[in-house]
UniProtKB/Swiss-Prot annotation:
Domain comment, as recorded: Contains two DNA recognition domains, each specifying recognition of one of the two defined components of the target sequence. The recognition domains can be exchanged between different S proteins, generating enzymes that have new sequence specificities.
Quaternary data: The type I restriction/modification system is composed of three polypeptides R, M and S; the restriction enzyme has stoichiometry R(2)M(2)S(1) while the methyltransferase is M(2)S(1).
Entry keyword annotation includes DNA-binding: yes
Function: The specificity (S) subunit of a type I restriction enzyme; this subunit dictates DNA sequence specificity. In the presence of the R subunit the complex can also act as an endonuclease, binding to the same target sequence but cutting the DNA some distance from this site. Whether the DNA is cut or modified depends on the methylation state of the target sequence. When the target site is unmodified, the DNA is cut.
Extra remark beyond the main annotation: Type I restriction and modification enzymes are complex, multifunctional systems which require ATP, S-adenosyl methionine and Mg(2+) as cofactors and, in addition to their endonucleolytic and methylase activities, are potent DNA-dependent ATPases.
Biological process per Gene Ontology, one example term: DNA restriction-modification system
Protein's UniProt name: Type I restriction enzyme StySPI specificity subunit
Disulfide bonds: none
Family: Belongs to the type-I restriction system S methylase family.
Xref: InterPro entries: Restrct_endonuc_typeI_TRD (IPR000055), Restrct_endonuc_typeI_TRD_sf (IPR044946), Type-I_RE_S_subunit (IPR051212)
Amino acid sequence: MNRGKLPEGWATAPVSTVTTLIRGVTYKKEQALNYLQDDYLPIIRANNIQNGKFDTTDLVFVPKNLVKESQKISPEDIVIAMSSGSKSVVGKSAHQRLPFECSFGAFCGALRPEKFISPNYIAHFTKSSFYRNKISSLSAGANINNIKPASFDLINIPIPSLAEQKIIAEKLDTLLAQVDSTKARLEQIPQILKRFRQAVLAAAVSGTLTTALRNSHSLIGWHSTNLGALIVDSCNGLAKRQGLNGNEITILRLADFKDAQRIIGNERKIKLDSKEENKYSLENDDILVIRVNGSADLAGRFIEYKSNGDIEGFCDHFIRLRLDSNKIMSRFLTYIANEGEGRFYLRNSLSTSAGQNTINQTSIKGLSFLLPPLKEQAEIVRRVEQLFAYADTIEKQVNNALTRVNSLTQSILAKAFRGELTAQWRAENPDLISGKNSAAALLEKIKAERAVSGGKKTSRKKA
């Protein structure tokens, strides 16, 4: 922040000039409780600082006699995470009026603004990328990143007049609240789209999606069946992890898929002899069922295999199903198996041992459902994919909008601390930014008051 680029009436000063750093309460582990009792005070720790506010759901409590009066959080304080194993945590801040008496631990500190400095202005400054980047560069430690009190001597903050500080803080309160509201609404959309996709699949497998095609609400041509009647061949995957003879074949693992979509680039290849190659080779539209997984949400899920033209096999974490293509489409089967009643049946068919969830071929073949004619299956698949493509387009637009919104906060903060949000206000209020109201005069007042009190910087030492 170059002094030559400052607006009229502004100045720059180290953060330590316009605030006093209060160090946190030191206590032993055995002195802390996880519940409140008489003569104890709640303690804010670094993990309680979230998104500029205090998360008070996981507080510890220490005896009041360990807490000095100066260490109690005041409404003006900006509490800072002073020490953390993560650079993304160290330096983060919270400024919030608490409804109860509270203090903060030794891994935190509080910036207490001077008399002529707006606490809200300082709080917004600690959200800026300029501040965060400076903190990141100044924090040091082998395993733990620490901010030293002297670090605040090295972080300069642009200072306008007190009146302008308050105007800037008010504008930021309004603008950033609007950004947060927009972000919150955008973040809800993926869940809405998830429910939309689930509703589409429910309509697909119940026949609702193709009522108009049948010209009837009755499921004409649909019949009850089980999966075993539609399977031509089933096989557990290859157990060995290496081979000595034969052709080198890609053996697919669960790591080669994400959300049932193929990931290219990190496949494992194993040499298979001709007998093994014949047994474990995949064909287009085969179904791979996740046979075993630590997650019950993943075990038993169906993945439609699409051939890339190469011979590929599959490992023993999968069961391969080869379907009768004259009776059922593989894509339609994934709709049946991965949502609703089909998924409920398969999940309840899992057996659990040593933290692993497993499903067997017998349980898979026992999956029962209503099967429409092949022509109607094709129409269902077409409509589902069309609706899913629509949802995917919306989701992509939402993600792009979220990226822009996330950058908007820093853009607004940067404009604020360059004086761009208050240019018109300064033009309309020259008396409030000049002479005795200028930032330079304000800093002189702070300097004079500190001289009289013996220098408040000494308060930065461990309280």
